[in-house]
Amino acid sequence: MAQVINTNSLSLITQNNINKNQSALSSSIERLSSGLRINSAKDDAAGQAIANRFTSNIKGLTQAARNANDGISVAQTTEGALSEINNNLQRIRELTVQASTGTNSDSDLDSIQDEIKSRLDEIDRVSGQTQFNGVNVLAKDGSMKIQVGANDGQTITIDLKKIDSDTLGLNGFNVNGKGETANTAATLKDMSGFTAAAAPGGTVGVTQYTDKSAVASSVDILNAVAGADGNKVTTSADVGFGTPAAAVTYTYNKDTNSYSAASDDISSANLAAFLNPQARDTTKATVTIGGKDQDVNIDKSGNLTAADDGAVLYMDATGNLTKNNAGGDTQATLAKVATATGAKAATIQTDKGTFTSDGTAFDGASMSIDANTFANAVKNDTYTATVGAKTYSVTTGSAAADTAYMSNGVLSDTPPTYYAQADGSITTTEDAAAGKLVYKGSDGKLTTDTTSKAESTSDPLAALDDAISQIDKFRSSLGAVQNRLDSAVTNLNNTTTNLSEAQSRIQDADYATEVSNMSKAQIIQQAGNSVLAKANQVPQQVLSLLQG
């Protein structure tokens, strides 16, 4: 080894080793001071990512357990109110049994009826005022989703029901046949014109003549035809057809499960408005002519373009759609397709329904619409109005046709005229200045009177038993969901514990190991400093050569 002064390689090597040991010592001290093995991604990149995901799960599951406990509280609050309602019903039943014996005087029956009315009023008060965190739990039908997991869709639903004297079938409950009973606000389903028709089909005449900017659809009223089935339609965005500009009559055929329609005006724009939902500028469709399919786009004006490249489509002399305009053909439109005759007769299928011409000129002739498109149809016995600026004329297929009109969220039956309000109630214009609210009496008939003359309830004990049965069924469902939520909380806590242990094994520092590493690093550091001092003295040995 050469004897040099300028470069002390031994000192450099020693310094490098001291620096490495210093880094290890710093890491050990950092881990011991924080309690974490992973203080940054450089300590363990993969471990840091895994531990971070565990953190998300643990925090989410911890909150989910709190949510589930809140859900249990909701169910307990609701069941507590139902328990009190049940107590009132049991007392009413006891009083009814007492009133049913012939030994009571009129005064006795009056006293019994007074307490029954007081108990029913208390049931209504409990229904209207029982809340959990500001939510009325017995005031209306609905559901409450409880998030019981750390990810989307991990919920448990609590079904809530409206429970009051009316929903229990006890509105106007009477044992003495005296006084008056309060009538309940009528809704659309109480209108006779919206009950299921006896005939297998019906005809619906639709006339649209209100605000042009309103989003409305003839399909809303088609869904009310007898034989339709499905869920309630609340907005026209749920349906696939727009509104034809001219009046069209639709007839439902139960055997073929389809609607047929007749119209005197079938211009491209009108047909496009019918096939094209008003929320969109264009509609994708498949046009079938002579067994050949062509995917197209249909704009608001009814013009057809190819779906694949947007090229303009033309209808040639044989009735086929083509991108080639060599023969001087004009652009294909919905009107041309719809009015094609004979072998050129076309079928236009959108994602919401199918239009089929019958092979004759479409000048008042029939067309058919696939009934399967109306998956959101409304059952007649549960029909509710879609509030919006629109007017409909409905004729069912029954022998004695019932006709109703709806405009701007208003339902009318002439005579008299009824209005369906946004909250589902009905008013009438018998009092043209203000409009009277329409009620349903205890006999089920519509009236503008707020009260009805009281009559003794027929089969009162059976009515009470049915009401108590409703309470029992509701309480059973709440008990079941409480048990389910309690089980969910237990599982969430177990999962959180296991995940926390797994995260700890990855992320937390092992103090025995780290203390050992720190002690080792400190000893090496001391030794390194001592050796460095000796290494720095090596160049001085060269001086002995100069002094010799």
From Swiss-Prot:
Q: Which InterPro entries match?
A: Flagellin (IPR001492), Flagellin_C (IPR046358), Flagellin_C_sub2 (IPR042187), Flagellin_N (IPR001029), FliC_H7 (IPR032826)
Q: Localized where? A: Secreted; Bacterial flagellum
First and last residue of the signal peptide: none
Mind listing the UniProt keywords for this protein, alphabetically?
A: Bacterial flagellum, Secreted
Any single GO CC term annotated in Swiss-Prot or TrEMBL for this entry: extracellular region
Protein family: Belongs to the bacterial flagellin family.
Protein name per the record: Flagellin
- Originating gene: fliC
